[in-house]
Design a protein with these regions (language model features):
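Extracellular/lumenal regions of secretory-pathway proteins
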Residues: 2-172
Length: 172
């Protein structure tokens, strides 16, 4: 009985240790003639990096001084938004476009999720009409996958988790 209880406990702990998520939240705000882009990167629901359209900054101590991920992500995010140069800013109303992409690694299985928001509401409708909303929906995934695909996400997730755990061991 006790052996069975310990076996279940160990399996549960391994499952918790083996569950991680890396998420990217791309945002493009259009207000009249002004457009502003941002990206927030999360590891296990903790923001680790922020990009303001020009500069990238670590938001958690273990990412300070990073020479691998920060330059790479700055390049990816800059390229991602540079492809939206033709975005229409002549609309008289505000547009808030969000593309959310995440990869999860749980119980030795990779899963991926993504969704799109327009002014805070999820949308999936593709039409032939050329609008910022349709352009964002039809090209965001392609633009990210050009530089960073699902397999890359899992590799980065594992590396960032290792970096986080090493930092905890070295400071704790």
């Amino acid at each position: 009985m006790h052996l069975q209880y310990y076996a279940i406990s160990i399996v549960s702990l391994v499952s918790l240790i083996d569950c991680h998520k890396l998420a990217f939240n791309f945002n493009l705000e259009i207000n009249g003639s002004d457009a502003h882009s941002t990206v927030d990167v999360f590891l296990d629901d903790y923001q680790i990096i922020t990009f303001d359209g020009k500069d990238i900054r670590p938001t958690i101590p273990f990412m300070i001084g990073d020479e691998i991920f920060l330059p790479f992500y700055k390049n990816v995010f800059s390229e991602f938004f540079s492809m939206f140069k033709r975005v229409s800013t002549s609309t008289p109303y505000e547009e808030d476009l969000t593309y959310y992409y995440e990869c999860n690694y749980t119980n030795n299985k990779s899963t991926f999720d993504q969704f799109y928001l327009y002014n805070g509401e999820e949308y999936t409708d593709k039409t032939q009409e050329v609008t910022n909303k349709n352009m964002w929906l039809t090209t965001s995934e392609f633009r990210l996958q050009k530089w960073f695909d699902d397999e890359d996400c899992i590799m980065h997730l594992r590396s960032l988790v290792r970096k986080m755990e090493d930092s905890k061991r070295n400071t704790g």
